[in-house]
Amino acid sequence: MDKRLLEILVCPVCKGGLIYLREQQELVCLADKLAYPIRDDIPVMLDSEARRLSLEEYDALRQRRAAPVA
């Protein structure tokens, strides 16, 4: 995934920032609890293609983002 593209992409619903999950090939919006797929290195930023995060996924991502960097 191109780093420059990641810097300018925002959530199409709330216009908020996204978290890139390389292993899952998804861009996640914590505000809306949505995960947008990345297919063949192309982000699919459509509401209809996004999946809702489970409560467990959401909590894990929030905790990971809040953890201090050592």
From Swiss-Prot:
Family annotation (Pfam families): Trm112p (PF03966)
Stored Gene3D superfamilies: 2.20.25.10
Cellular component, GO, one term: cytosol
Source taxon at top rank: Bacteria
SUPFAM superfamilies: Trm112p-like
InterPro entries in the cross-refs: Trm112-like
Protein family membership: Belongs to the UPF0434 family.
Cited PANTHER family: PROTEIN PREY, MITOCHONDRIAL (PTHR33505:SF4), ZGC:162634 (PTHR33505)
Protein name as it appears in the record: UPF0434 protein MCA0634
Biological source species: Methylococcus capsulatus (strain ATCC 33009 / NCIMB 11132 / Bath)
Lineage: Bacteria, Pseudomonadati, Pseudomonadota, Gammaproteobacteria, Methylococcales
